């Protein structure tokens, strides 16, 4: 049965495909269901994949500020030996190094990222300074003084095969995984950038609860069986066949 547009509301968990912007997914959802009041609980860069919490309807978009403050978990790959201006794979290469860190060095440096740490937001970020986003300054070739922010992280090394360092990190709001990759490169003395990023969890919502984001581009796709409440419960369970 087709739902009336105004009755479509809830939390939709989407696995963002690589190469898509967060806002392009929102636009696809608006076209699909005809509801304009759609928010989110945290964007992802185009190269990143994983959990996007989409909030449909006024009742749920009001939860955006609360959900933005929830912890998140990521699987990431840092590429050692190369530095970029954006700290990620979309940036311009600004440095190279032939140093190959040892496993002992990697273990020592990754152990730093436990508990509260001080982190400076990257210049290519949406963080505002003096009413202007940092990336706007960066695109003008300017580097602005930025304040340290205290964030909480729990980093676990998964695998190290030079030049790639695989890790999983649980972190608080405002943590830049790009900056962690960049800082690891500095600590190891070889430079690094973030090559891959996948959000595994946002608050209590996990990747195994998500639908493929490409489905939002399929005309007539019915999102109603996948809508959840704020606690993650399915609002309209699919019928048992």
Curated annotation (Swiss-Prot):
EC number: 5.4.99.25
Organism annotation: Chlamydia trachomatis serovar D (strain ATCC VR-885 / DSM 19411 / UW-3/Cx)
Keyword Hydrolase: no
Molecular function GO labels: pseudouridine synthase activity; RNA binding; tRNA pseudouridine(55) synthase activity
Task performed by this protein: Responsible for synthesis of pseudouridine from uracil-55 in the psi GC loop of transfer RNAs.
Reactions performed catalytically: uridine(55) in tRNA = pseudouridine(55) in tRNA
Superkingdom, natural source: Bacteria
Recorded family membership: Belongs to the pseudouridine synthase TruB family. Type 1 subfamily.
Keywords in alphabetical order: Isomerase, tRNA processing
One Pfam family from the record: TruB_N
One GO term of the biological process aspect: mRNA pseudouridine synthesis
Protein's name in the database: tRNA pseudouridine synthase B
Coiled-coil residue spans: none
Annotated active site: 45 (nucleophile)
Taxonomy of the source species: Bacteria, Pseudomonadati, Chlamydiota, Chlamydiia, Chlamydiales
